[in-house]
Amino acid sequence: MNMSKQGIFQTVGSGLDHILSLADIEEEQMIQSVVRTAVTGASYFTSVDQSSVHTAEVGLHQIEPLKTSVDKPSSKKTQGEKFFLIHSADWLTTHALFHEVAKLDVVKLLYNEQFAVQGLLRYHTYARFGIEIQVQINPTPFQQGGLICAMVPSDQSYGSIASLTVYPHGLLNCNINNVVRIKVPFIYTRGAYHFKDPQYPVWELTIRVWSELNIGTGTSAYTSLNVLARFTDLELHGLTPLSTQMMRNEFRVSTTENVVNLSNYEDARAKMSFALDQEDWKSDPSQGGGIKITHFTTWTSIPTLAAQFPFNASDSVGQQIKVIPVDPYFFQMTNTNPDQKCITALASICQMFCFWRGDLVFDFQVFPTKYHSGRLLFCFVPGNELIDVTGITLKQATTAPCAVMDITGVQSTLRFRVPWISDTPYRVNRYTKSAHQKGEYTAIGKLIVYCYNRLTSPSNVASHVRVNVYLSAINLECFAPLYHAMDVTTQVGDDSGGFSTTVSTEQNVPDPQVGITTMKDLKGKANRGKMDVSGVQAPVGAITTIEDPALAKKVPETFPELKPGESRHTSDHMSIYKFMGRSHFLCTFTFNSNNKEYTFPITLSSTSNPPHGLPSTLRWFFNLFQLYRGPLDLTIIITGATDVDGMAWFTPVGLAVDTPWVEKESALSIDYKTALGAVRFNTRRTGNIQIRLPWYSYLYAVSGALDGLGDKTDSTFGLVSIQIANYNHSDEYLSFSCYLSVTQQSEFYFPRAPLNSNAMLSTESMMSRIAAGDLESSVDDPRSEEDRRFESHIECRKPYKELRLEVGKQRLKYAQEELSNEVLPPPRKMKGLFSQAKISLFYTEEHEIMKF
């Protein structure tokens, strides 16, 4: 018998608890009246009984002295957060570089009746969770090559394959490691994932060939691959019956009447808002894994693949194997399926600036077998991209800054940090033009790879070792923004190259450094990189293992350096808020008739091409990260000498709206428009409108990287409509151009691989759009259908033809009579008196003279 001993105060307290409080919250019973009405329940079940009696209870739950089962009782953690084998595949020697060995929707594969976790998931509607995966391979010592395993939020879309290392990733090297583990948080535009009807996948695991598989004689031509996955931090919500459905401040309308500055945040920001109040939006990192991005160094500090070259057994000692210009714009990797120019993260960021400076860090990752042996020497020659280095011998190269790498052993990567050595404080981005002026240079020199010791190996293994080249930047400063889409570089003055990036302390830590100017003090010390900020001692040696995130975090310092000094700029041009606070072109449209409206959605999706999708800089920027939330500033420029009344309004996603991208009469009432919030204007009194679009959405965030899934909802910020009245034929053409910029309340979460160069689409020229019929030519006055019918009628009938011929005869008769009665002096030569030059039209956009 189980007896409990209580003191007098414990007994009294227990009695008071029964009198004054309810029973246990999990199993509750309360007698409410003398007619025995009771409310009972357990968890999410409640029962109201009108003729109830007390519960009959006998005995208490007992603990076994001798356990019948010694395993831990099952729970959500043991059942729902254990590893399950979700995929098996073979990596073959026939797989080319960047071949996708596996592309897995991890959550969909975990939702499987073969796995115990489905017993929990199928009875719930929504969930929040993280994902952890393991990828295992079993190579032999006679096999060499590498794979990259990257967890991509939603879909890879048009991101550069060479920049997959921007995502949470693991590198598999047959000579170094045979397993990688990746753990990711919940990243989604919505607060929870709907198991029965998902909007789009949460996480996609892609496994691609990073270095082709080579084998020795008699070795298997494949390596097997297994993928394990589990949920982490699993939260289940919405109990549901079992379903047979399977998983699927101040106000202003314009800056001045005809002048508006789009160049910087202070002048481009809107002070008028479509919001109900002059409200602010609070920060919320809960759906973005807490990874908020504010600076472009988030991308420039991550290793991304730029080039690959072989170290062959036929290479002689002192032979130059690879020559790499030292600038951040270089990349050589391409792919055919899908067709990509695989730009690196560093080149993608730096291509958008006029000037750069900083220390570039090259990572050389080798893929040998355990039976290969050899050494490489890496040498930096200061100068520019045009210097001739073909005559520099191995002995001469040891005079310059150099490092030697032994490819044999457990360390796979040489990290070579090139110090900033230049005759100018900055280098210029010359890829925007083809002409070259003496003194204008892009690179600070060249990096040369020499054969230091010949490659030796048994005859039954491959006679070469592949080397991947990555690049990053330390103390990087870029300034003076521009728009430019880089092509695959045959580097200026040389057709060989490659670059790499250093890895941060943790993968995907945003803003690992603030570049040359600190955020705390924009006028303070410059060029403070990770090593300077953290104050740590530089590690001895430049060799590391890039496959291991713990070892890859070493701060590179190959050679001793001085601190770079004080920046000449008081503003950090690499700040996202400064860069995108400048207004960038969004779209343009022209009205042809009176009492019409035009609606255009602001969609971030990269699957929508200009002119209906984001063009150029906006397209590039909104695909650099997974999630966006917060308001946007819209600047509308009005062109044409008109006196037209207009009204603009903003419609959040999900509500009634007129047909987008069509000039038409509005089907919406004035009550509906003004209830949404409208702005009235007159085009004679103002030439521009600057207005803030509020963050009004039922979503947590929107995304530009859904690749067609959820494009209509989860990638659209909202819709803007403009309606005009009192537009007549005395007015010139009426055109609107729209520009978009971010605000200080904008938030950007979770970095993505930048768009590959093939997906960078610019706005079409005005002439091409006029030729395509998208815009009306500004040369012709708008005419109604009635005018055109009248003109065609006149041309057909030719009225007064006979009368005009008769008048002509009489005038000729009178002229002849007048000549016969007068003696005229001899005619004088009037040189060029009535000569007329050819008529020409000068079109300013194309800078061409069209002569008629």
Swiss-Prot record:
Q: Which GO terms describe its biological process?
A: monoatomic ion transmembrane transport; symbiont entry into host cell; virion attachment to host cell
- Where is the site described as Cleavage found in this chain? A23, D24, Q245, M246, Q491, V492, S765, M766, Q836, A837
Please give one Gene Ontology molecular function term for this protein.
channel activity
The family database entries (InterPro entries) matched by this protein are listed as:
Hepatitis_A_VP1-2A, Picornavirus_capsid, Rhv-like, Viral_coat
Task: Supply the alphabetized keyword list.
Answer: Capsid protein, Host endosome, Host membrane, Host-virus interaction, Ion channel, Ion transport, Membrane, T=pseudo3 icosahedral capsid protein, Transport, Viral attachment to host cell, Viral ion channel, Virion, Virus entry into host cell
The record ties this protein, via Pfam families, to: HAV_VP, Rhv
Q: Which segments carry the region annotation Involved in P1-2A pentamerization? A: 766-836
Concerning PTM, the database record says: Viral protein genome-linked: VPg is uridylylated prior to priming replication into VPg-pUpU.
Domain of life of the native organism: Viruses
Family according to the record: Belongs to the picornaviridae polyprotein family.
Q: What is the protein named?
A: Genome polyprotein
The organism encoding this protein is Human hepatitis A virus genotype IA (isolate CR326)
